[in-house]
Every structure is written in C-alpha cells, then in structure tokens.
Curated annotation (Swiss-Prot):
Residues of the propeptide: 23-45
Signal peptide positions (record): 1-22
Entry's localization field: Secreted
Any one Gene Ontology cellular component term annotated for this protein: extracellular region
Coarse class of the protein's main subcellular location: secreted
InterPro entries xref list: Conotoxin (IPR004214)
UniProt-recorded name of the protein: Conotoxin VnMKLT2-021
Originating organism: Conus ventricosus
Domain description: The presence of a 'disulfide through disulfide knot' structurally defines this protein as a knottin. The cysteine framework is VI/VII (C-C-CC-C-C).
GO molecular function: ion channel inhibitor activity; toxin activity
Span list, region Disordered: 25-44
Family the entry assigns: Belongs to the conotoxin O1 superfamily.
Any Pfam family matching the protein: Conotoxin
Entry keyword set: Cleavage on pair of basic residues, Disulfide bond, Knottin, Neurotoxin, Secreted, Signal, Toxin
Length: 72
C-alpha cells in the first residue's frame, strides 16, 4: 500500500515536471520565434552573394569563387 502511494506521488510529480517544462518551452518559442525557426538557416532560403560583394568563403558566392574577400 505504501509503495503504491509512493509510486502514484512519483508519477504525479514527474507529470507535473513535464507539463511545466513543456509550458515554459512553448512560452519561450512565442517570445523568441526566430530562435525556433530554422527556415532562415536552411540552404533553400539563403541567398548567394553577387559578383563584387564582400564574402568570407567560396560557398557564400553565387559563382562559388571568393578571392581576397570579394566574390567573382
């Protein structure tokens, strides 16, 4: 009987922890929607740099050619 009560209390406690964590996570998503969205970081939404623009690596240029930090 005591073990059953302890198990029930433990399950209720863990359920409450799960619900409060989920609620705070959802609130954080609403406060900072850009942190949860990976659309801006995906390759489909990234734009490439045109010729003459400042670059830092070859893959950021449309031509895939970055020399002396300038796209060619």
């Amino acid at each position: 009987m005591k073990l059953t009560c302890v198990l029930i209390v433990a399950v209720l406690f863990l359920t409450a922890c799960q619900l409060t964590t989920a609620a705070s996570y959802a609130r954080s998503e609403r406060e900072h929607p850009d942190l949860g969205s990976s659309d801006q970081n995906s390759k489909l939404t990234k734009r490439c740099l045109a010729s003459g623009e400042t670059c830092w690596r070859d893959t950021s240029c449309c031509s895939f050619s970055c020399t002396n930090n300038v796209c060619f």
